Amino acid sequence: MAALTMAACGNKEESSSSKEQAVREAMGDYLVKEIGAHYLQGELCVPTLMIVAGEENGDETQVWCDCWVDWYRVAGDTLKTVSGGNHSGLMTIRMQDGKPVVTAFEQTTDGAGFLPSAKRIFGQHFDVYERMHASQDVRDAARKEQLKEYVSRRGLNVSYYQDYGWDAVEL
C-alpha cells in the first residue's frame, strides 16, 4: 500500500524500480519546492510520501497519495519540527527531458469540503486512502522510515525527530 508499484515484466524490473524511485524523487521535489515554500521554514524540508495507487499511461503517471511536508531544525542529534502539514490528492507526472516532473497536483480541500473532495479525487481508491489517512500508526511508520532514509542519504548525525510538545522519537 505504501509503495508505488509500476508494472514490470521480465528483465524490465530493474528499470521499473529506478523509474519508481525517479517518480518518488519528482514528487518529493515538488512537495518541497511548491508546497514547502508556503510554510514557516526551518533548515530541512522533508516530505513523507504515502502512495495510495499509481497508474501509468504512456509518458504520464498518475499517483494518488497522502503526503506530509515537514520543516525541521537540527538541535544536536534531533530534528525538531518547525512547521508542516498534510497534502492529499492526485499528482500527474510527465516525462520532460528524460526525467519525471510533477505537472499537476489536485489536492483535497480543508474543512467541510474535505470528504466530498477526497471521494471525488480518490474515486475507486477512496477506501484505501481513507484507511491510510485515518491511521496514525501508518503515518508514524512511513514518516520514521522515510526520515531515517533521508538522514542516512545525507550523512546527518541525527538519531531522533521531535514534534513540539511531544517526546523525541528514535529513528
Where do the language-model regions lie?
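Soluble non-cytosolic domains of exported or imported proteins
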Residues: 21, 80-83, 137
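Sec-dependent N-terminal signal peptides
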Residues: 1-2
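Mature extracytoplasmic domains of secretory-pathway proteins
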Residues: 47-112
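C-terminal motif of bacterial Sec signal peptides marking the signal peptidase cleavage site
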Residues: 5-8
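N-terminal export/targeting and maturation segments
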Residues: 11-69
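Low-complexity, intrinsically disordered terminal/linker segments enriched in charged
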Residues: 103-171
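General "foldedness" signal
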Residues: 41, 45, 77-79, 114-119, ...
